[in-house]
């Protein structure tokens, strides 16, 4: 097994193919301490683990427990799951409040079990074994004073060098316990031998997941969201990098949260230069009441270590999510090339307009028409009708089935847009059920995009939302749903939750979303679901569990997408990124880019179109058959291959270059985008990655044959392209 318990020194060894994670139970108090996480250590029976790495000894001006030297000074000890209020002043993993108002908890080792496979987390998205078997360690911990117990759950995915972590807390006492903070994972590292950086992904609407690296300084640094979703602004990810780490060298520790709501991810450099990383639900506005016998399951953290820089971390996450998070028939299936009518028509459409787009699309190699916002109620703008999921027959005379049948007759699939979590004040649903809105009694509610948020913590609200959406999907041959969420949560209050459970609303809302999507997929197992939230505000591993692709950003400009997609590709397989060729001037910022470049950039994702193909220039329209053929030619490679970053436009401000190489190293596709042209500039040298040095490769465009070692070490030359925003694809196959 990949997990072993060594009785002689009470250590736990968790191994993957290239990494080891070691913990130890120490002292009479049975503290669980972190020993090591990094490159794989060879275990030899009878040889003790390097428990000397755990900090011990006196810490001046710090309280101690029982005056013992070993771990009595908690403020310097590498705790595996630290509590609060008892002398460890660093970031805690769990904090509580008793009915008496007291704080303070320390969870100590009681027992453990090692099992084959991986238990599911109740009501939460989580990774699963798939074809690769897993081993799971469950540490049973207890705080005897409060009666709080914990199950620390560790699962090893050996082939992809990943360890997942989660926590289940339970109240065994007679009195209630209030959880005020629950982190899913804590990682204490002794990094006194060198300096480290942290890497996070920041952004806003229209420019999500921008990579940002900074030096780790003393104190706490991190990112989080209190918006009710993972957000445009920050991403539920943090990485610790050795100061000299590059794209392909150096140490990287990554933590990624399988959750779609409020989160907090932090790294803390202590007074002793040790580092504590924590990740979990954001404690702001979070209080969870546990009655006797009740449990709370925390969402999962996907943790990995790479000694091969960011590329190593990226490959671990890509392989992990492809095989162990994404579900359903579309996980391994080519996605249809779709055209979405949003940027083509916005709310101004009818059956005739949609059929004209569909007719043209069917001639160009496009495979599905998606009807976006505006098809229901009396919705001609964004001020009305959310919640009234019934067809507007003034726009679609004869109803939805007639339109879908006509589109299907042209050889196209049909998809549709919903926003099931929202409600318009001007809607029949709101007039009938104003109490279904998340709101604070006595306070005028806040609107965003002219809408309120439905209280999905309530079963009757979830049932109504599901039944409304399901009725539409049953009414016609609808094979795709775009699930949108166009505002964040505020005015937090639920008329159903008692006073001492109002702090549970944020999390209960997210659980409600998960339940809805799970029910939808169970009812419609062949449905292709694409999640969206004002673009990429809920692009996270939690959503990926339900939908194999997520709309990457509402900014479809090819040049802005280079930065957005670079940050996204750092963690997510390319097949998960919703990416479309859109119109120019671009609707988000007015930039004009060549149609060819728009196609090349969108090819890195799911690939589709978001424009009125009946009105675009003929020169552009004539390129679409070649682009759709390009998608089919390279799709298997892009969906299954290894992604390599060669150059970053975010860093150099001039050009972007990345490639995908097949797992067997027999094929590769290089994408090169010249953002800004330069006068009197010679060819640019580009060194490829991920090839076999022994293989010889033919460059399809020129017929030239070069060795893999030559292409990776000496590189290839790319001549300057004429003009800004120009691009080139370079296809290589084994000669």
Spans of model-derived segments:
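C-terminal beta-strand-rich structural cap/linker in extracellular carbohydrate-active enzymes
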Residues: 708-735
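Polysaccharide-binding surfaces and accessory modules of carbohydrate-active proteins
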Residues: 5, 9-13, 17, 21, ...
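Active-site neighborhood of glycoside hydrolase catalytic domains
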Residues: 397-399, 431-433, 437-594, 606, ...
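Carbohydrate-binding surface patches
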Residues: 238, 247, 649-692
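Short Pro-Gly-centered flexible turn/kink motifs
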Residues: 104-109, 288-307, 726-733
């Amino acid at each position: 097994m990949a997990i072993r318990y060594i009785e002689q020194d009470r250590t736990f060894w968790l191994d993957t193919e290239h990494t080891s994670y070691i913990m130890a139970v120490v002292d009479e108090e049975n503290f669980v301490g972190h020993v090591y996480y990094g490159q794989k250590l060879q275990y030899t029976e009878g040889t003790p683990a390097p428990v000397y790495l755990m900090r011990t000894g006196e810490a001046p001006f710090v309280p101690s427990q029982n005056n013992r030297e070993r771990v009595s000074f908690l403020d310097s000890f590498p705790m595996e799951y630290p509590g609060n209020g008892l002398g460890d002043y660093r970031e805690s993993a769990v904090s509580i409040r008793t009915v008496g108002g007291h704080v303070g908890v320390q969870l100590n080792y009681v027992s453990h079990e090692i099992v084959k496979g991986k238990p599911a987390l109740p009501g939460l998205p989580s990774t699963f074994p798939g074809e690769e078997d897993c081993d799971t360690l469950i540490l049973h911990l207890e705080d005897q004073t409060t009666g709080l117990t914990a199950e620390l759950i560790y699962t090893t995915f050996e082939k992809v060098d990943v360890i997942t972590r989660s926590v289940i807390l339970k109240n065994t006492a007679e009195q209630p316990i209030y959880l005020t903070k629950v982190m899913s994972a804590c990682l204490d590292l002794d990094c006194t031998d060198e300096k480290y950086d942290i890497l996070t992904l920041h952004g806003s609407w229209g420019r999500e997941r921008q990579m940002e690296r900074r030096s780790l300084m003393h104190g706490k640094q991190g990112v989080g969201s209190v918006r009710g979703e993972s957000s445009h602004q920050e991403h539920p990810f943090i990485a610790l990098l050795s100061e000299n780490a590059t794209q392909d060298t150096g140490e990287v520790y990554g933590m990624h949260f399988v959750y779609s709501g409020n989160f907090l991810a932090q790294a803390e450099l202590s007074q002793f230069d040790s580092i504590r990383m924590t990740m979990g639900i954001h404690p702001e506005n979070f209080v969870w009441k546990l009655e006797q016998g009740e449990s709370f399951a925390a969402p999962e953290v996907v943790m990995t270590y790479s000694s091969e820089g960011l590329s190593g971390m990226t490959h671990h996450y890509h392989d992990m999510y492809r095989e162990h998070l994404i579900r359903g028939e579309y996980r391994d299936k080519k996605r249809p090339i779709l055209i979405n009518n949003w940027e083509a028509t916005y709310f101004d459409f009818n059956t005739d307009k949609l059929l004209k787009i569909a007719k043209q699309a069917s001639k160009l190699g496009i495979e599905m028409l998606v009807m976006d916002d505006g098809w229901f109620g009396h919705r001609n703008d964004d001020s009305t009708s959310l919640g009234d999921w019934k067809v507007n027959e003034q726009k679609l005379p004869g109803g939805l089935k007639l339109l879908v049948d006509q589109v299907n007759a042209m050889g196209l699939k049909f998809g549709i847009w919903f926003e099931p979590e929202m409600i318009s004040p001007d809607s029949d649903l709101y007039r009938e059920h104003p109490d279904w809105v998340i709101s604070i009694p006595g306070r005028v509610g806040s609107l965003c995009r002219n809408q309120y948020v439905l209280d999905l913590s309530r079963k009757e609200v979830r049932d109504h939302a599901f039944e409304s959406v399901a009725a539409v999907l049953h009414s016609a041959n609808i094979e795709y749903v775009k699930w949108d969420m166009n505002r964040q949560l505020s005015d937090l209050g639920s008329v159903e939750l008692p006073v001492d459970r109002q702090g549970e609303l944020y999390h209960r809302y997210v659980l409600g979303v998960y339940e809805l999507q799970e029910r939808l997929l169970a009812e419609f197992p062949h449905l292709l679901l694409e999640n969206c939230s004002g673009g990429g505000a809920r692009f996270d591993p939690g959503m990926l569990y339900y939908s194999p692709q997520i709309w990457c950003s509402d900014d479809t400009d090819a040049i802005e997408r280079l930065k957005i997609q670079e940050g996204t590709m750092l963690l997510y397989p390319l097949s998960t990124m919703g990416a479309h060729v859109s119109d120019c001037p671009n609707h988000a910022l007015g930039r004009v880019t060549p149609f060819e470049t728009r196609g090349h950039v969108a090819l890195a994702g799911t690939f589709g179109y978001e424009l009125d193909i009946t009105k675009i220039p003929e020169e552009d329209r004539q390129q679409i058959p070649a682009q759709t053929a390009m998608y089919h030619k390279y799709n298997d490679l892009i969906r299954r291959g290894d992604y390599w970053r060669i150059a970053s436009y975010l860093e150099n401000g001039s050009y972007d270059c990345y490639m995908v190489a097949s797992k067997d190293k027999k094929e590769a596709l290089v994408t090169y985008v010249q953002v800004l042209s330069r006068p009197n500039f010679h060819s640019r040298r580009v060194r490829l990655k991920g090839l076999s040095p022994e293989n010889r490769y033919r460059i399809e465009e020129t017929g030239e044959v070069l060795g893999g070692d030559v292409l990776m070490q000496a590189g290839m030359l790319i001549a300057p392209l004429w003009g800004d925003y120009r691009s080139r694809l370079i296809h290589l196959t084994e000669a």
